[in-house]
Amino acid sequence: MKVGVVGDRETAIGFRLAGLTDVYEVKNDEEAVKAINELANNENIAFIIITERIAESIKDKLKNINKVIVEIPDKHGKLERIDPVKELIRKAIGVSMK
């Protein structure tokens, strides 16, 4: 089984240097969706690594993907996002989890 990667230029270069071959450098959401669909339809791909920023911008399209998707920070660092489980707990019982 292989790993697929979808990311910006720097992310793609890093994974290519690490020896991965199924690496897509994308510049916009349309290219990202096309690359992820190609990887998702490849039976040799076990999971797909994408940058958090790409995942955030196309999150609706990722719901239909049947592969494991791993989000990683890009060169700008980790995105500050609300943990959905913590938010559900806060709404349900009124207590913020840290």
UniProtKB/Swiss-Prot annotation:
| Its membrane topology | Peripheral membrane protein
Q: Name one GO molecular function term.
A: proton-transporting ATPase activity, rotational mechanism
Q: Name one GO cellular component term.
A: membrane
Does this entry carry the keyword Transport?
Answer: yes
Source species, domain of life:
Archaea
Q: How does activity depend on pH?
A: Optimum pH is 6.0 for ATP hydrolysis.
Q: List the disulfide bonds.
A: none
Q: How does activity depend on temperature?
A: Optimum temperature is 80 degrees Celsius.
Q: Which UniProt keywords apply?
A: ATP synthesis, Cell membrane, Hydrogen ion transport, Ion transport, Membrane, Transport
Location relative to the cell: Cell membrane
| GO BP terms in the entry | proton motive force-driven plasma membrane ATP synthesis
The entry describes its oligomerization and partners as:
The A-type ATPase is composed of subunits A(3), B(3), C, D, E(1 or 2), F, H(2), I and K(x).
Q: What family is this protein classified in?
A: Belongs to the V-ATPase F subunit family.
- Domain characteristics, as noted in the entry: Purified ATP synthase is 25.9 nm long. The hydrophilic A1 domain is 9.4 X 11.5 nm, the central stalk is 8.0 X 3.9 nm and the membrane-bound A0 domain is 6.4 X 10.6 nm; the domains are connected by two stalks. ATP is synthesized or hydrolyzed by the A1 domain while ion translocation occurs via the A0 domain.
Functional summary from the UniProt entry: Component of the A-type ATP synthase that produces ATP from ADP in the presence of a proton gradient across the membrane.
Record's protein name:
A-type ATP synthase subunit F
Which source organism? Answer: Methanocaldococcus jannaschii (strain ATCC 43067 / DSM 2661 / JAL-1 / JCM 10045 / NBRC 100440)
